[in-house]
Amino acid sequence: MMLAQVNSIAFRLFGIPVYWYAIIIVSGIALAVWLSSREAVRVGLKEDDVFDFMLWGLPAAIVGARLYYVAFQWQDYVDNPIEIFFTRNGGLAIYGGLIGGGLALFFFTRHRFISTWTFLDIAAPSVILAQAIGRWGNFMNHEAYGPATTRQFLENLHLPTFIIDNMNINGTYHQPTFLYESVWNVLGFIVLVLLRKKPHFLKEGEVFLGYIIWYSFCLLYTSP
């Protein structure tokens, strides 16, 4: 059977490969920033508060995501640690990015005298949507798949053929946990936006708490 394997390289720029992973991750971040800036204005902050935070948060999130990934895949780097600095092929962990970005957010809001909880409420729906988008970067990189399964099981889910084909990793089919998480996070985005539109029912920080609860249920199912 001929499998339709996706190419992780989108195109080459002056001979340098540009990966779908990077394009998708950056697209998710850009959308999250835009949505957060609109919400910031709605609650009385400035767009610049969001854009300025990105100068703090984005580097911290990237470093956190990389360190988290390397820490749990150290056997891949122990013999060639210089590879730690190369991320074009992927190797970023969402959880580490959230930790790094969260630390940056704490110090940024203290510096700007902005409520940390308000900022978290602003960001939470956008972040979970960016995570939903980012999981497709993992798919293009042949990452974030789950336990072994059968092709028949995947076909019974009525998934598109290109997804089924690309869940064949080294001859074994796997659960598309990237897809499960992506769909779950899109639903989470909708729920959090609806909650945010009911401020009289919620206290400061409870939209963010909703994000934590929603995403925790996702991890219970998709994490090994």
Protein language model features and the residues they cover:
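A feature for loop-to-transmembrane-helix boundaries and adjacent hydrophobic helices
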Residues: 1-223
